[in-house]
């Protein structure tokens, strides 16, 4: 059935993506920090492999609208099914170390720059 096929696909893809990321990240020693982006960080247990978690949040209706604009071949039902397989945003927000609001009421870039400054300061103060 479909859920079983999706699970098999995830079992094949996620470990390889993680290996690829680790290979890439290990070559970034000169960077003040490294960011890993993935829609399923918590679901895949990848949150346990990073020092801090940033969650970008937006209302569900806006997320759906953005996916439909980006992926014109998807239906709203397909997008909702994808979102339903993810953790609820509220749970991700509770577990987050940092939040970025991407709800069109706040500018995103200033929020990102603020986090960049924090991460660079931590790097300098830790001396590593």
Language model regions located:
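ATP-dependent small-molecule kinase phosphotransfer cores
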Residues: 1-33
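Small-molecule kinase domains that catalyze NTP-dependent phosphoryl transfer to phosphate-bearing small molecules
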Residues: 15-21, 29, 47-49, 70-120
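Switch II (G3) loop of P-loop NTPases
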Residues: 33-43
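Conserved phosphate-donor/acceptor-positioning beta-strand/loop module used by diverse small-molecule
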Residues: 35, 47-70
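A short, charged, Gly/Pro-tolerant segment at domain boundaries
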Residues: 121-128
């Amino acid at each position: 059935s479909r859920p079983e096929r999706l699970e098999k696909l995830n079992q094949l893809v996620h470990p390889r993506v993680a290996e690829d990321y680790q290979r890439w990240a290990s070559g970034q020693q000169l960077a003040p920090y490294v960011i890993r982006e993935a829609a399923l960080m918590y679901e895949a247990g990848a949150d346990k492999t990073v020092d801090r978690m940033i969650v970008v949040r937006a209302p569900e209706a806006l997320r759906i609208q953005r996916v439909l604009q980006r992926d014109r071949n998807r239906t709203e039902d397909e997008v909702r099914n994808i979102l339903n397989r993810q953790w609820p945003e509220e749970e991700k927000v509770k577990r987050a170390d940092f939040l970025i609001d991407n709800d069109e009421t706040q500018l995103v870039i200033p929020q990102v720059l603020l986090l960049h400054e924090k991460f660079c300061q931590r790097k300098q103060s830790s001396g590593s």
